[in-house]
Amino acid sequence: MAGPKRFNKDKRPKRNTQSLLFKRKRFCRFTAAGVEEIDYKDIDTLRDFVSENGKIIPARLTGTRAIFQRQINTAVKRARFLAMLPYSDQHRSL
């Protein structure tokens, strides 16, 4: 009886290492602008950090610092509670 086939390391598709090396360096736009606090009433800024589904985009994708990411989270949650931002954009029509 033949045993379970093992995955051969040589036949694995190789990753494109060049794209990993030349990623664009992300920077915190709040640090660059000199912002100290993020306001929940600034809807235009907050919309840049919310996806189409209504989820808050993580800091590793946006490049914001941890301090500002926490402020974005609280500001988005406050704006949602006050109905300035929707919880989700996908409303089903009956």
Curated annotation (Swiss-Prot):
Gene Ontology CC: one annotated term: cytosolic small ribosomal subunit
Matching PANTHER family: 30S RIBOSOMAL PROTEIN S18 (PTHR13479), SMALL RIBOSOMAL SUBUNIT PROTEIN BS18M (PTHR13479:SF40)
Signal peptide per UniProt: none
Transmembrane segments: none
Disulfide cross-links: none
The protein's assembly and partners: Part of the 30S ribosomal subunit. Forms a tight heterodimer with protein bS6.
Listed Pfam families: Ribosomal_S18 (PF01084)
Function: Binds as a heterodimer with protein bS6 to the central domain of the 16S rRNA, where it helps stabilize the platform of the 30S subunit.
Any GO BP annotation: translation
Family: Belongs to the bacterial ribosomal protein bS18 family.
Source organism of this protein record: Polaromonas naphthalenivorans (strain CJ2)
GO MF annotations in UniProt: small ribosomal subunit rRNA binding; structural constituent of ribosome
Lineage of the organism: Bacteria, Pseudomonadati, Pseudomonadota, Betaproteobacteria, Burkholderiales
Domain of life: Bacteria
PROSITE patterns documented for this protein: RIBOSOMAL_S18 (PS00057)
Identification of the protein by name: Small ribosomal subunit protein bS18
Alphabetical UniProt keywords: Ribonucleoprotein, Ribosomal protein, RNA-binding, rRNA-binding
